[in-house]
Structure formats: structure tokens, C-alpha cells
Amino acid sequence: MPYLDHAGSTLPSKTQLEELAKLQTQLILANPHSHHSTAIKTQQIVSSARHRILRYFNTTADDYFVVFTNNTTHALKIVAENFNFGHRTQEGVVSEISAVLKGGPSNFAYFNDSHHSVVGLRHVVLGKVDAISCVNEDVVKEECIPKVENSLFVFTAMSNFLIPFQINEKLISGWSVCVDAAALVSGTRLDLTAHRPNFVAFSFYKIFGYPTGIGALLVKKDSSKSIEKTSFAGGTVQSVDEMTMHFVIRDFERAYEEGTINSYGIAQLQKGFEEIERCGGMQAIRAHTYDLRSKAVQILQSKTHPNGKKVVEIYSQPHIQVSPETQGAIVAFNLVRPDNGYYGYTEVEKMCAIFGIELRTGCFCNIGACKKYLGITSEMIKENMSKGKRCGDEIDLINGRPTGAVRISFGRMSTEQDIEVLKQMIDTCFVSSEKVFSPSLQSLKIDSFLPTVVNLFSFPIKSVGSVAKSRYELTPRGFKHDREFLVVKDDVTLNLKMHPELCRLTATIVNDEELHIQTFDQNDNLVIPMSLSLKENDAKVVCKKTIATFDCGDKVGQWLENALDMTNCRLLRVAGESKKNFVNDSPFLLINEASVYMLARHIDMDVQDILTRFRSNIVVRGLPPFIEDTAKRLSIENLEFEVVDKCTRCEMICVDPMTGEKDPSLLLALRDYRNKQKMTFGIYIRQSNFEPGQFVEAGSAVRFFTD
């Protein structure tokens, strides 16, 4: 699975999860506020975790406190809510945001390029400060930083849009600095001997993927008096009286860890740190991810349309000398059309889903960065909102301008294959080309992808339209009632290739009780009870298989003759005891949505139209195009299947199932792709562990294997 959202959340490794599972079966913890032996053991584990965290950041308990929090946002909010801004010199609340740093007492500042969790703190401190400043990161490089007192700067250590920022020691000497390290810790170890900020906020899942729901606030000990706890909760006091205002706060760390802490989550942190060590430490991870980012940028920059126009617009700061120290493992970009217009990021995300690529789109909860790199103004934000634009929605272009971007980010488990699949997706879906793209499957391994079932179809009557459902019961013959009926004329089987008149019919089975056949215009309808007493017919040979059948009777035959404008038509049904149905070669036909999309784009045909023409039972999403050709077996949840063969295609796919008209373009596109090989598309599969009462459902996870 090409996972390219490590800045959002990195992934735990298989070894890490196995170690955690073993730990959970052996570990028994208790409320650390109690005093029995299990509670004392819990206290010791928590204390050990604090020391392990400090060691990771190259500091000790002599210099920093460790306060456990729910996440980075929670840690930042603790600082903002409890910071001592001193006595204000102005009345009222701040009504305007300054674009420069202010001097004097009671100031709050943050970068333009900050996460919304940081920007939102301004409303926490609104009534406590004289000035709020939102500044460009270049301001901290200036020699003259205004002198302040009792002031807080929430400093973004690394933009989740682009790059890490450098901390100016002059800033630290004048302000209380709270570092938002959420994005930074995903690929870099913050060394607290090189920089000694007053506060550091981060989440552990950003470092090693698991556990979620637990973060930390590191507080420099000589800065601890700059925040003051004015309330208390369970486990936070030394003494309290419910009838008076008397209370005395316990030690610093527990004062801010209100209630019972996440002891099991804290115990799991050790396995995360061990995982980082197995990878060679964060320095090795940073080198690995920087190398991948460099290769990705090189590939993206090389993409051009036939007219020479660039396909990818990468957002960067040209004046910065790129290195592992100045560049995070993040690439933000948009895709550009041959006419210099933009592809919307929602369209890109949908194509990525087809290819199994997971990345981030939008503004990444960082509107300041979007404004800076996309040329959006404050007025445009308000205007866009009046047009319906909301955070997290699918409105990706307004007046032809992007409202967000595409972001890829790398982690310790990222590989070059992730980049290769992204390259294939861009080449297939967004590079203007006059010839079909032929992806190379040699470097890709299908068993590393995690696709899902997106569509299920059955065909009650062979060569008649499909029935789409989200759930189908399995039988030894395939989906229940799939190809259970067959139309014959003069004892010869009718198929769509030779008799496009069949496209006039649709069929569905209602509650396993009735077969409903309709003309396409729905002017005529035939209902056949599934319990109808049928007349046994001679066995029929269909695709070299001899199948016992029943005749559905004269009334049904007459209806078909009228609907198809033919004579001597009969509807046959597979005999109940038969282990075969009217499928051509195998109980199931599986196709890959990305392969469909690639052909659709080449001939400018609707994807749903092509899906209908290929008449599959199972459609999967989340694979690169045509990689399904390499599979030998697969599983859908706990259902196991073997690959019987590839499906060789004929001119039947040229028939428009809606009109019966023939158009050879799809077959020609497939021929061009196969390049003198058999024109196959999709794979035939057969279940190998069938048991009665099994079902397959849309949304189910699929695993492919090549052995």
C-alpha cells in the first residue's frame, strides 16, 4: 500500500504491533493514585516512561518536566490557558492581529504558517494580552527583536506544509517559547541541548504510529513558574477542603495530568522507542526519508505534457539551501493541465484512491501556508466561503484557482515503490498523451497493496444486464443466481456479441422469490416465480460445458419473442442440482478499477460505461493498473480464491450495453496496451474454501499473493 501521509500519522511496523500485542497480554496495570502493589508498579512504569522520553530528546529530569497529555493540541492549550501574561496595560480585548512583533508586556505571537491548533490559541488568550501578532517566519531572523515581558511565542518547529524553521536564540532570550513539534518529530529528533525552549508539545503517534491519543508537554524547569495552575482535579492536590477555597497543588507534572492518566498507553511507548532504535535511530530515518523526498521531487519536476508544459507545480522556498536540516520529508504540490489550468486536488485524491495511494489534500489545517504558497488573500477566503467553500470539503477550484494542494510525506517504512506508484498514477491520469501508458509491473509487488472491493455484480440472465448489490451469497457456482438463466433461439444460445438485441432487457431477482425481466424502456415487465414448476429440457452445451436445464415455459418464451422481436425464443434455467451455471470459464471474474480508468482515459470513454462492458462480478480499488495480472491467489476477508486464468477479451466489449451499437475503440485500446500479446482484461477466480452460508460484501479488504 503506497502510504504517503506520514506527516499526518506515521505507521506502526508489524514487529512493533506484535510486540505490543505480547505486552498487552502480559501487562496488568492499575490506577496510579492507589497504593497497592499493582498501582505502585504502574507508578514505576510511568516514571520510567518520563525518563525514556527525556533521554530521547537528549535531556534529563534535571532540566525538564514531562506532562502527559491527550495530544499536541491539548499540550498547547495547557500552556495558553495557564500562562502568566502579567498585568495588562490596555482595556478591552484585542480586536486586530498585528503583522509584526510588538514590544512591552503581555504579548502572544505565532507564525502565519501554523497549524490551526496554534492559531486557535489566540482565542484562549484574547482577554489576557495587550497584543496578538501573526508574523512571517523571517521575522525571527532579524537582529532587532522587540523586548517583551510576560509574553508567549508559540513557535512552529516544522510547517506541516513544507519546511522546518530555525529557532533564533535572541527570541528565546526574550520570549517564553512554546514549540509545536508535532510535524517535526515525525522525521527529526529535537535535541534539547542545542535549543532549550520553555515548552515543547508533541504527540507520540507522530513519532512511531502507535499509541494514538497520547502526547506530552515538556516544560523547562526554570520556566515552570511562568504557568500557574488555578484549578485542580482528581490526583492533583496535596490538600483540599470542600467547604473553603483551600487547596494545595501536588507536584508540577501531576498538577496538569488531571484525572487518571492513560497508563496502558504510556507503557506502550517503550515499544515505540525500541522500534526507532531498530531502524537505526532518528538520524537514519531522517536520511532515508530525505533521500526518498529528493527522488520524488526529481520525478515530479521531470513530468511534462507533450506541449512542453510542466505537469507538477511544487511549492518551495527557492532561497533555502535544501538539506536534511532545512527540509522536512514533505512535498506539497498541485497538478497542472496542458493549458496551464489546474487539476483540482479532489480529482487527484480520487485517482489516488483507485491506485491505492494514500496521501493528504486540502490546506492540511494550515490556512496561513495555503495563503502564502497558493496566493490566497484574506478577502478571497471570505469570498470563497460565500460560494460554499468549507474546510475539508471537495471544492478544490474556485475561479480556476486551487483552494488547497496535494501533500506527500515520507516515514521510516516508506519505499521507492511508493514513489513509483505515484508516478504511474500521474502518468496514467494527468499527463496529456496521445498513446496509452504501459505501466511496468516488474518493480511493483501486488502483495504490498491493500485494495478493497468496491462493486459486486451478478447477471441473472446470461448476456443480459447486471444487478449491483453491496452483498452477495456465495455458492459453488459463484454468486447465488448468477448466470442461472439463459435465452435461446431455435435451440441456439443467444449472446450480446451476436445478438445485441439482448441489451433491451434488464433482469433482477427479488428476495430470492421472483425473477423480474423488464424491457429497457420499462414498458413491459415479466415476473417469474423462482418456485415455478419447470419442464426438464435437454442438456445444453454452453462454452464447451454440458449443463442440465429446465425450460421456463411457453408464456415466458412468448414474452421474450415480443421483447426481442424474434421467433422461437425460450428461457432456460440451470437445473437445481447442477454444479455448473452459464458462466463462460470460471465462477467469478475480477477486474481492477485502475485498469478500467487507464483505458477509459485513453479513449475518452466513461468509466462506468467500460465497467459495464467488461461484465465483471467483483471490482477492486487500490491497485496500480494491470498489476492484477501477476496474482496467483487472493483472499477477500476470510474467503480464499485461486486465480484460474486471465480473461481473454473479444469484440463483445465493443457493444454498448445501453444501445447495442458497436464501437471498436475499447478493444483497440486493449490491443495497443497488450502489444502483440493476448488481449486479456481481468482475472478468472474460483473459491477454494467454500462453505454454505458465506457472503462477500462491498468494502471488504482484499489481499493478493503471487505464490
UniProtKB/Swiss-Prot annotation:
Any single GO BP term: Mo-molybdopterin cofactor biosynthetic process
Pathway the protein takes part in: Cofactor biosynthesis; molybdopterin biosynthesis
InterPro entries noted in UniProt: Aminotrans_V_dom (IPR000192), MoCF_Sase_C (IPR005302), MoCo_sulfurase (IPR028886), MOCOS_middle (IPR005303), PyrdxlP-dep_Trfase (IPR015424), PyrdxlP-dep_Trfase_major (IPR015421), PyrdxlP-dep_Trfase_small (IPR015422), Pyrv_Knase-like_insert_dom_sf (IPR011037)
Domain of life: Eukaryota
Domain MOSC: 558-705
Protein EC: 2.8.1.9
Post-translational modification N6-(pyridoxal phosphate)lysine, affected residues: 206
Keyword Transmembrane carried by entry: no
Any one GO molecular function term: molybdenum ion binding
Catalyzed reaction equations: Mo-molybdopterin + L-cysteine + AH2 = thio-Mo-molybdopterin + L-alanine + A + H2O
HAMAP family given in the database record: MOCOS
PANTHER family according to UniProt: MITOCHONDRIAL AMIDOXIME REDUCING COMPONENT 1 (PTHR14237:SF19), MOLYBDOPTERIN COFACTOR SULFURASE MOSC (PTHR14237)
Protein's name in the database: Molybdenum cofactor sulfurase
Gene name as annotated: mocs-1
